């Protein structure tokens, strides 16, 4: 099988990822589980040739120099794929993440109604967080698409690499890829403020300068969507503040308390039939009470504020899991495995 056939097989079997690793057969991840494809093991030369075939010259040069590279590419009529090519102890390797060619709607993703409201906010910082593979990009793509269909504005995305491709509908959408169309998230964000955007998507807020610029953009009247690899709203606030030196922390808390609109922390759960996965969400909104907790560094009290904030559209992860169990969408055992307080789901 060549790389196109392997990716077609992967997509047909609803796999989220395809893994190539010298010395082993290709493997796919289906509903969270890794499974081997029933073909012979690939050697280093085969894997190397497969990934070289889909790289451009700049990507090959980067791979040779740094021994790993991130990029995305599309197979017409099949899907887009986000690729990380690297080396391991048996030779060449690569991980391919499937990016559906069609952007799912917030309704198709079973997102709570508050997501649609957040996508249309005029300004502020909306963060979608969670571990790798938790569907952050899919959720953000749906939110941007919701905005694109309902508002006349300029949406600017900064990604590494570009994942979902947005057509300009009611909005003008410009997508920039780090490494190909801009040197870094920070340099693209600095330029963004002179490019007349209404909304900015920052694919990953991974360093101090990017976080500072994203908060500044939100503070100066832009809607900013961003992602972090944190597992809860409280940890997200801590992570942002901890990036800054001690003498700036109070100022950052003040900035964050003014600009934060929402933190959505999500995790994917296997559905009851075992035929797919569904997201559970912790949702924290920038209510006056939450803003005050951020300003006064009372992060430990955020869980209680979220618990009590149902009327505003807030929910804890356990409240989301309980709702999914009640609606018979996930099992009690699955909820227990994802919960931060497993004893809430006895059995």
Where are these regions (language model features)?
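Short, flexible helix-loop junctions that flank or precede catalytic/ligand sites
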Residues: 1-347
């Amino acid at each position: 099988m060549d790389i196109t056939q392997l990716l077609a097989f992967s997509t047909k079997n609803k796999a989220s990822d395809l893994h190539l690793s010298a010395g082993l057969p290709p493997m796919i991840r289906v509903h969270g589980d890794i499974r081997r494809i029933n073909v012979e093991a690939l050697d280093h030369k085969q894997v190397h040739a497969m990934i070289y075939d889909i790289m451009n010259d700049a990507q090959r040069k980067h791979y040779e120099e740094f021994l790993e590279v991130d990029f995305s590419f599309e197979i017409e009529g099949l899907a887009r794929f986000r690729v990380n090519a690297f080396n391991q102890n048996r030779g060449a390797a690569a991980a391919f993440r499937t990016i559906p060619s069609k952007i799912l709607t917030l309704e198709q993703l079973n997102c709570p109604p508050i997501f649609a409201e957040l996508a249309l906010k005029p300004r502020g910082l909306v963060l979608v967080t969670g571990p790798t593979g938790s569907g952050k990009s899919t959720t953000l793509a749906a939110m941007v698409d919701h905005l694109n269909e309902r508002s006349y504005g300029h949406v600017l995305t900064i990604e590494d690499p570009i994942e979902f491709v947005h057509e300009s509908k009611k909005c003008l959408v410009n997508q920039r890829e780090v490494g190909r169309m801009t040197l870094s998230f920070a340099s693209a964000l600095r330029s963004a403020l002179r490019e007349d955007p209404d909304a900015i998507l920052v694919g990953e807020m991974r360093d101090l300068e990017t976080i500072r610029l994203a908060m500044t953009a939100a503070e100066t009247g832009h809607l900013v969507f961003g992602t972090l690899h944190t597992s809860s709203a409280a940890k997200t606030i801590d992570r942002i503040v901890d990036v800054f030196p001690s003498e700036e922390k109070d100022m950052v808390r003040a900035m964050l308390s003014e600009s934060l609109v929402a933190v959505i922390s999500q995790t994917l759960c296997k559905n009851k039939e075992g035929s797919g996965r569904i997201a559970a969400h912790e949702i924290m909104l920038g209510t006056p009470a939450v803003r005050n907790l951020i300003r006064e560094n009372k992060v430990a009290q955020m869980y209680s504020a979220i618990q009590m904030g149902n009327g505003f559209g807030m929910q804890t992860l356990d409240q989301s899991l309980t709702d999914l169990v009640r609606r018979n969408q996930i099992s009690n055992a699955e909820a227990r495995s994802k919960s931060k307080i497993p004893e809430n789901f006895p059995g």
